[in-house]
Amino acid sequence: MAFGSEINVVKPRACVLVLPGGRVRSDEASRWWQLANVRMMMVAAALRRRLGRDVEVRRVQYRVRGWNSPRYDAVADAGAALDAVRHRFDPKSIVLVGHSMGGRVAARLAAGGQVGAVLALAPYWPRNDVDLIPASTRLLVVHGTADTRTDPDSSRIQTWRARQRGLDAHWVGIEGVGHFMVRRMGEWHRRTTDFVAEYLQC
Protein backbone atom coordinates (compact mmCIF):
# COMPACT_ATOMS: atom_id res chain seq x y z
CA MET A 1 0.00 0.00 0.00
CA ALA A 2 1.34 3.41 -0.96
CA PHE A 3 1.06 6.38 1.37
CA GLY A 4 1.51 9.51 -0.72
CA SER A 5 4.54 10.51 -2.71
CA GLU A 6 8.05 9.23 -2.17
CA ILE A 7 10.24 11.38 0.07
CA ASN A 8 13.65 12.19 -1.33
CA VAL A 9 16.15 12.29 1.51
CA VAL A 10 19.28 14.27 0.67
CA LYS A 11 22.38 12.41 1.80
CA PRO A 12 25.24 14.85 2.42
CA ARG A 13 28.29 14.18 0.28
CA ALA A 14 30.71 16.26 2.36
CA CYS A 15 31.18 17.53 5.90
CA VAL A 16 32.52 20.72 7.48
CA LEU A 17 33.56 20.75 11.13
CA VAL A 18 33.57 24.23 12.67
CA LEU A 19 36.03 24.61 15.56
CA PRO A 20 35.71 27.57 17.97
CA GLY A 21 38.51 29.30 19.77
CA GLY A 22 39.29 29.08 23.47
CA ARG A 23 42.02 29.67 25.99
CA VAL A 24 45.50 28.29 26.52
CA ARG A 25 44.47 26.90 29.90
CA SER A 26 41.00 26.80 31.45
CA ASP A 27 38.77 24.18 33.07
CA GLU A 28 35.77 26.51 32.88
CA ALA A 29 32.85 24.92 31.05
CA SER A 30 32.41 26.00 27.45
CA ARG A 31 28.95 27.55 27.02
CA TRP A 32 27.11 28.31 23.80
CA TRP A 33 26.68 32.01 24.67
CA GLN A 34 30.40 32.73 25.04
CA LEU A 35 31.80 34.92 22.26
CA ALA A 36 34.07 32.24 20.80
CA ASN A 37 31.09 29.92 20.36
CA VAL A 38 28.58 32.53 19.22
CA ARG A 39 30.97 33.80 16.58
CA MET A 40 31.45 30.34 15.11
CA MET A 41 27.71 29.67 15.25
CA MET A 42 27.45 32.57 12.83
CA VAL A 43 30.18 31.12 10.62
CA ALA A 44 28.41 27.74 10.63
CA ALA A 45 25.12 29.41 9.70
CA ALA A 46 26.78 31.22 6.80
CA LEU A 47 28.22 27.92 5.59
CA ARG A 48 24.84 26.20 5.77
CA ARG A 49 23.20 28.98 3.78
CA ARG A 50 25.86 28.80 1.08
CA LEU A 51 26.34 25.03 0.88
CA GLY A 52 22.78 23.81 1.35
CA ARG A 53 21.75 20.31 2.39
CA ASP A 54 24.40 18.72 0.20
CA VAL A 55 27.02 19.41 2.88
CA GLU A 56 26.76 18.60 6.57
CA VAL A 57 28.02 21.46 8.76
CA ARG A 58 28.75 20.70 12.41
CA ARG A 59 29.99 23.11 15.05
CA VAL A 60 32.01 21.40 17.75
CA GLN A 61 31.06 22.27 21.34
CA TYR A 62 34.04 21.73 23.63
CA ARG A 63 33.48 20.53 27.18
CA VAL A 64 35.86 23.13 28.62
CA ARG A 65 37.37 26.32 27.23
CA GLY A 66 41.05 25.41 27.46
CA TRP A 67 43.63 23.79 25.19
CA ASN A 68 45.06 22.40 28.41
CA SER A 69 48.33 20.75 27.46
CA PRO A 70 49.14 17.91 27.99
CA ARG A 71 45.47 16.79 28.13
CA TYR A 72 44.58 18.63 24.91
CA ASP A 73 40.89 18.74 25.85
CA ALA A 74 39.79 20.64 22.74
CA VAL A 75 41.64 18.21 20.48
CA ALA A 76 39.96 15.27 22.21
CA ASP A 77 36.50 16.78 21.76
CA ALA A 78 37.06 17.74 18.14
CA GLY A 79 38.66 14.36 17.47
CA ALA A 80 35.55 12.64 18.78
CA ALA A 81 33.43 14.77 16.44
CA LEU A 82 35.67 13.81 13.51
CA ASP A 83 35.50 10.12 14.46
CA ALA A 84 31.70 10.38 14.48
CA VAL A 85 31.53 11.49 10.84
CA ARG A 86 34.57 10.19 9.01
CA HIS A 87 33.14 6.70 8.42
CA ARG A 88 30.46 8.38 6.26
CA PHE A 89 32.70 10.60 4.15
CA ASP A 90 35.78 10.32 2.02
CA PRO A 91 38.63 12.13 3.81
CA LYS A 92 38.96 14.53 0.89
CA SER A 93 35.36 15.64 1.42
CA ILE A 94 35.95 16.72 5.04
CA VAL A 95 36.90 20.34 5.75
CA LEU A 96 37.98 21.83 9.07
CA VAL A 97 37.24 25.50 9.78
CA GLY A 98 38.90 26.74 12.97
CA HIS A 99 39.20 30.15 14.61
CA SER A 100 42.06 31.06 16.96
CA MET A 101 42.67 27.99 19.15
CA GLY A 102 40.34 26.17 16.77
CA GLY A 103 42.96 26.69 14.08
CA ARG A 104 45.46 24.90 16.28
CA VAL A 105 42.97 22.10 16.87
CA ALA A 106 42.47 21.84 13.11
CA ALA A 107 46.21 21.46 12.53
CA ARG A 108 46.36 18.64 15.07
CA LEU A 109 43.41 16.82 13.52
CA ALA A 110 44.73 17.29 9.99
CA ALA A 111 47.97 15.59 11.00
CA GLY A 112 46.18 12.24 10.81
CA GLY A 113 45.52 12.63 7.09
CA GLN A 114 41.76 12.25 7.55
CA VAL A 115 40.69 15.62 6.12
CA GLY A 116 41.04 17.29 2.76
CA ALA A 117 41.21 20.97 3.62
CA VAL A 118 41.80 23.34 6.52
CA LEU A 119 40.63 26.94 6.81
CA ALA A 120 42.35 28.69 9.70
CA LEU A 121 40.83 32.00 10.81
CA ALA A 122 43.24 34.09 12.90
CA PRO A 123 44.93 30.87 14.03
CA TYR A 124 46.82 30.47 17.28
CA TRP A 125 49.92 28.63 16.06
CA PRO A 126 52.58 29.27 18.71
CA ARG A 127 54.79 26.31 17.86
CA ASN A 128 54.84 26.15 14.08
CA ASP A 129 51.66 24.09 14.23
CA VAL A 130 51.20 24.32 10.47
CA ASP A 131 54.06 21.84 10.14
CA LEU A 132 51.62 19.16 11.32
CA ILE A 133 49.40 19.58 8.26
CA PRO A 134 50.21 17.02 5.52
CA ALA A 135 51.27 18.18 2.07
CA SER A 136 48.12 16.60 0.60
CA THR A 137 45.89 19.03 2.52
CA ARG A 138 44.63 22.27 1.05
CA LEU A 139 45.09 25.27 3.35
CA LEU A 140 43.76 28.80 3.55
CA VAL A 141 44.73 31.15 6.38
CA VAL A 142 42.78 34.39 6.88
CA HIS A 143 44.11 36.83 9.48
CA GLY A 144 43.32 40.38 10.50
CA THR A 145 46.44 42.50 10.15
CA ALA A 146 45.68 44.36 13.40
CA ASP A 147 45.27 41.19 15.47
CA THR A 148 47.02 41.56 18.83
CA ARG A 149 45.97 38.20 20.29
CA THR A 150 47.38 35.91 17.62
CA ASP A 151 50.25 36.89 15.36
CA PRO A 152 49.38 37.53 11.69
CA ASP A 153 53.06 37.71 10.72
CA SER A 154 53.67 34.28 12.24
CA SER A 155 50.70 32.72 10.43
CA ARG A 156 51.83 34.32 7.15
CA ILE A 157 55.35 32.93 7.51
CA GLN A 158 54.04 29.51 8.49
CA THR A 159 51.74 29.50 5.47
CA TRP A 160 54.71 30.32 3.24
CA ARG A 161 56.63 27.44 4.80
CA ALA A 162 53.69 25.12 4.14
CA ARG A 163 53.82 26.09 0.47
CA GLN A 164 57.52 25.27 0.44
CA ARG A 165 56.59 21.77 1.64
CA GLY A 166 54.18 21.34 -1.24
CA LEU A 167 50.83 22.34 0.24
CA ASP A 168 48.32 24.28 -1.80
CA ALA A 169 48.47 26.98 0.86
CA HIS A 170 47.45 30.64 0.77
CA TRP A 171 47.39 33.48 3.30
CA VAL A 172 44.95 36.40 3.14
CA GLY A 173 45.18 39.48 5.35
CA ILE A 174 42.15 41.58 6.23
CA GLU A 175 43.55 45.07 6.63
CA GLY A 176 43.14 46.81 9.98
CA VAL A 177 40.97 44.11 11.54
CA GLY A 178 41.52 42.46 14.93
CA HIS A 179 41.03 39.00 16.32
CA PHE A 180 37.34 38.38 16.92
CA MET A 181 36.06 38.71 13.34
CA VAL A 182 33.48 41.32 14.38
CA ARG A 183 34.65 44.15 12.13
CA ARG A 184 34.02 43.43 8.45
CA MET A 185 32.09 40.34 9.46
CA GLY A 186 30.69 39.90 5.98
CA GLU A 187 34.18 39.61 4.52
CA TRP A 188 35.15 36.91 7.01
CA HIS A 189 32.00 34.98 6.10
CA ARG A 190 32.47 35.49 2.37
CA ARG A 191 36.07 34.31 2.39
CA THR A 192 35.10 31.30 4.48
CA THR A 193 32.15 30.23 2.37
CA ASP A 194 33.93 30.95 -0.93
CA PHE A 195 36.88 28.76 0.03
CA VAL A 196 34.79 25.84 1.26
CA ALA A 197 32.33 26.02 -1.65
CA GLU A 198 35.13 26.18 -4.21
CA TYR A 199 37.03 23.31 -2.58
CA LEU A 200 33.93 21.09 -2.37
CA GLN A 201 32.73 22.29 -5.81
CA CYS A 202 29.35 23.39 -4.48
Where in the sequence are the language-model features?
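Short alpha-helix in the alpha/beta-hydrolase fold that links the catalytic acid
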Residues: 151-161
